[in-house]
Amino acid sequence: MSDTVIIAGGGPVGLMLACELGLAGVDTVVLERHDAPREPSRGGAINATVVELFTQRGIMESLRDDGFEFRMAHFAHIPLAPERVPGDRAFSFAVPHAQVERRLEERARSLGVRVRRSTEITSVRQTPDGVQVTTGDGEVVEGAYLVGCDGSASLVREQAGIPFPGVDPDFHGLWGDIKVEPGAPVLERIGARQYELGLCMVAPIGPDTVRVITGEFDVPSPPADQEVGFDELRAAVARIAGVELDGVPGWLSRWTATSRQAERYREGRILLAGDAAHTLFPLGGQALGTGIEDAVNLGWKLAATVQGWAPPSLLDSYHEERHAAGARACASTRAQTTIMRSLARVGELRALLTELAGLEEVNAYLVRMVGGIDGSRLPDVPLVTAEGETSVYRLLEAGRGVLLDLGAGLPAVRHPQVTYVRAEPTNRLDATAVLLRPDGVVAWRAPQDGLEAALETWFGPAA
């Protein structure tokens, strides 16, 4: 049986998973139908959870010069204040998703991953001890496992027979990148705004280019594959925002606020991640953030399974943990789209929620939820060890488990999958010792009992 893991789809989620597997030393091949990252990028930012996960693996350093941090967030386009939230958490980062894809591909290749572009998958088959994938030119690629990161219309999910229930709400719109002249009327509408008939967002994405996104409810939606004309976008902007959109159109497209989730993330040796597992309206970067979390959660578990040291049911915990997270993300974005309806319908409700968002506890709750930092990962706190200064996330760069002793006086734990680190106590962490999984999730913390049980549950017997 081959020990290769096959990843269908070389977008950010598939490439992040490839990086995780490559870091663990697993033979990995990515099959991607496009010959290069798609331009222009549909997404222009990553949220706090992606920043933290990239920092855990040393990836953010390669992206720092490609974008900039911004301390803004929103819930259904109701402004929030991330800078008022206590704790050492990351902020969002503006960077085109195509550039994220390029950086991840560079890293994956440096870790020995084979990234095969212009390679389309046409069929998938499970065997008793592996998987077989047939490509467009008739080649059969064999592996131990297949992970479908091939988007909302996933062929892998379809051929694995995994249902994909959900809703197609009556909310849809247009978006386009438009080159405009200085002083163009549309520049007076910079930002995301709700209007009587819907929403219109205008965001600069270059020296003379803006991205324009419109959204309307209760209006018949043309077929998703129907070509968008500039006149259609101009008419929508005028109808909703009451402003003329003049300029030279570049990329134009249409979108819908579809929300769907796979019934299960695993079918034998086939697994799903990213949009193949859950499709949601990409508000505040939640869609990509949820997908990157899938990749980091799955990577070490799949590596442990392929390498033979995984405890029983470790791989099954991927569905248990990430399906619940995906359901929550879908619910969050559905709730937001509900209160993004026209002001004529929900104006009073939005006014009340805007007032509530001014309360510190409500602001903090919403910032953490939309940023994906409300879970069980630690912040990147500076640490001092006998070897010198480090931080929580630097300890995780190797992709191993970490037992961090912050004054608990634990005996040095010797486990082949866990690194023991003794650091000076810090009041920035509410624990005297923590056991971190390779994905940064806290598996145990002192003074609770159960360290040995947690080690065996997540990393197997020490010998």
Swiss-Prot record:
Flavoprotein keyword on record: yes
GO molecular function, one term: oxidoreductase activity, acting on paired donors, with incorporation or reduction of molecular oxygen, NAD(P)H as one donor, and incorporation of one atom of oxygen
UniProt keyword terms in alphabetical order: Antibiotic biosynthesis, FAD, Flavoprotein, Isomerase
E.C. code: 5.5.1.-
Superkingdom to which the source organism belongs: Bacteria
Alphabetical GO biological process terms: antibiotic biosynthetic process
Family classification: Belongs to the PheA/TfdB FAD monooxygenase family.
Name the record gives this protein: Dialkyldecalin synthase
Organism: Streptomyces rugosporus
Gene: pyrE3
